[in-house]
């Protein structure tokens, strides 16, 4: 029969082992960012890792476990209050006495993560590719235009020197095939707009050469 002293020693050992396991599971290391990382850096790292390890895209046996870990880290570090608690207290801020997450996280109970929601800020995916691409490029690349001042060539230039969208272009080209992208270094995406009440037919053309993206509106008609 175990004595109270042996039970106490056993409990201490379990606690120490749990702390060691949690200490080795550093959320910043999981996402590959420094502790001083900005919200944008954390989000960028999460997007990149989620694209790589999401079970719908990665069929390796450990992909789901890795994705859970990534999502758990992002769940904490993307929230300012939770991140502050984590930085001060560590994992114990979100665990019960048994070393389990105590906040009712969906990642603890079941695996239910919407891959489409992951890229809602970069809306280039989905069944209706043309509609989503149009929305994306109009939101991010096209300046508001007054109806009376539309011109045949309205140019906008953007530098993607290592920025977030540049990385997204590279990642998406590796994983997906777009009809709007050709095999050379020139990338062209076209979206079309029909203006009601007139016979004018306009399209938004976005071209990428190297690190420069040029967008213009091409209008034709009576």
Swiss-Prot record:
Presence of keyword DNA damage: no
Is Phosphoprotein a UniProt keyword of this protein? yes
Q: Give the main localization category.
A: endoplasmic reticulum
Q: Where is the J domain?
A: 26-90
**Phosphoserine (modified residue): where?**
133
Q: Where is this region: Divergent targeting domain?
A: 91-222
Which residues are the signal sequence here? 1-23
One biological process term in Gene Ontology: response to endoplasmic reticulum stress
Instruction: For this UniProt record, give its keywords in alphabetical order, as a comma-separated list.
Output: Chaperone, Endoplasmic reticulum, Phosphoprotein, Signal, Unfolded protein response
User: Where does this protein reside within or beyond the cell?
Assistant: Endoplasmic reticulum lumen
**Gene3D superfamilies, from UniProt?**
DnaJ domain (1.10.287.110)
CC terms in the record's Gene Ontology section: cytoplasm; endoplasmic reticulum; endoplasmic reticulum lumen; nucleolus
One matching Pfam family, short form? Answer: DnaJ
**What terms describe the molecular function in GO for this protein?**
Hsp70 protein binding; misfolded protein binding; protein-folding chaperone binding
Q: Which InterPro entries match?
A: DnaJ_domain, DnaJ_domain_CS, Hsp70_co-chaperone_J-domain, J_dom_sf
Q: What does this protein do?
A: Co-chaperone for Hsp70 protein HSPA5/BiP that acts as a key repressor of the ERN1/IRE1-mediated unfolded protein response (UPR). J domain-containing co-chaperones stimulate the ATPase activity of Hsp70 proteins and are required for efficient substrate recognition by Hsp70 proteins. In the unstressed endoplasmic reticulum, interacts with the luminal region of ERN1/IRE1 and selectively recruits HSPA5/BiP: HSPA5/BiP disrupts the dimerization of the active ERN1/IRE1 luminal region, thereby inactivating ERN1/IRE1.
Entry's free-text remark on domains:
The J domain stimulates the ATPase activity of HSPA5/BiP, while the divergent targeting domain is required for efficient substrate recognition by HSPA5/BiP. The divergent targeting domain specifically recognizes and binds to aggregation-prone sequences.
How it assembles, according to the record, is:
Interacts with HSPA5/BiP; interaction is direct. Interacts with ERN1/IRE1 (via the luminal region). Interacts with DERL1.
Protein name (database record):
DnaJ homolog subfamily B member 9
Task: Name the source organism.
Answer: Rattus norvegicus (Rat)
């Amino acid at each position: 029969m175990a004595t109270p002293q042996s039970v106490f020693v056993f409990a201490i050992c379990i606690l120490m082992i749990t702390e060691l396991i949690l200490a080795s599971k550093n959320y910043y290391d999981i996402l590959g960012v420094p502790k001083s990382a900005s919200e944008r850096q954390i989000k960028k790292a999460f997007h990149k890792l989620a694209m790589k390890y999401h079970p719908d895209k990665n069929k390796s046996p450990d992909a789901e476990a890795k994705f859970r870990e990534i999502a758990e880290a992002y769940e904490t570090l993307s929230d300012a209050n939770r991140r502050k608690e984590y930085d001060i207290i560590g994992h114990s801020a979100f665990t019960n006495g048994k070393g389990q997450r105590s906040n009712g996280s969906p990642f603890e109970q079941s695996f239910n993560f919407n891959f489409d929601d992951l890229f809602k800020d970069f809306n280039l995916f989905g069944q209706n590719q043309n509609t989503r691409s149009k929305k994306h490029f109009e939101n991010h690349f096209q300046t508001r235009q007054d109806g009376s001042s539309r011109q045949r060539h309205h140019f906008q230039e953007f530098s993607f020197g290592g920025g977030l969208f540049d990385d997204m272009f590279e990642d998406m080209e590796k994983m997906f095939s777009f009809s709007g992208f050709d095999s050379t270094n020139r990338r062209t995406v076209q979206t079309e707009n029909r203006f009601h009440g007139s016979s004018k037919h306009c399209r938004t053309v976005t071209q990428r050469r190297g690190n420069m993206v040029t967008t213009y509106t091409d209008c034709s008609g009576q």
